[in-house]
Amino acid sequence: MHLMYTLGPDGKRVYTLEKVTPSGEITKSAHPARFSPDDKYSRQRVTLKRRFDMLPR
């Protein structure tokens, strides 16, 4: 079992252990992706996130 989350009506995360909510919405993993020092595409990802204003402030 992994910790999962879905967004509540107020936009905040609601944590659960289920893969699907009772309303039928698929939940997302609450854990970050694995880090690899050999990541070849990190610069492109950061550039895209900066371009579309998706970086946390």
Swiss-Prot record:
Supply the InterPro entries for this chain: H/ACA_rnp_Nop10, H/ACA_rnp_Nop10_sf
Where does this protein reside within or beyond the cell?
Nucleus, Nucleolus
Q: Does the keyword rRNA processing apply?
A: yes
An MF annotation (GO) of this entry: telomerase RNA binding
List keywords of the entry alphabetically. Answer: Nucleus, Ribonucleoprotein, Ribosome biogenesis, rRNA processing
Under SUPFAM superfamilies, the record lists:
Nop10-like SnoRNP
Q: Does the keyword Ribonucleoprotein apply?
A: yes
GO CC annotation terms, alphabetical: box H/ACA snoRNP complex
GO biological process terms held by the UniProt record: rRNA pseudouridine synthesis; snRNA pseudouridine synthesis
Regarding protein family, the annotation reads: Belongs to the NOP10 family.
Q: What does this protein do?
A: Non-catalytic component of the H/ACA small nucleolar ribonucleoprotein (H/ACA snoRNP), which catalyzes pseudouridylation of rRNA and is required for ribosome biogenesis. This involves the isomerization of uridine such that the ribose is subsequently attached to C5, instead of the normal N1. Pseudouridine ('psi') residues may serve to stabilize the conformation of rRNAs. The H/ACA snoRNP complex also mediates pseudouridylation of other types of RNAs. The H/ACA snoRNP complex mediates pseudouridylation at position 93 in U2 snRNA.
Protein name per Swiss-Prot or TrEMBL: H/ACA ribonucleoprotein complex subunit NOP10
User: What is the organism of origin for this protein?
Assistant: Eremothecium gossypii (strain ATCC 10895 / CBS 109.51 / FGSC 9923 / NRRL Y-1056) (Yeast)
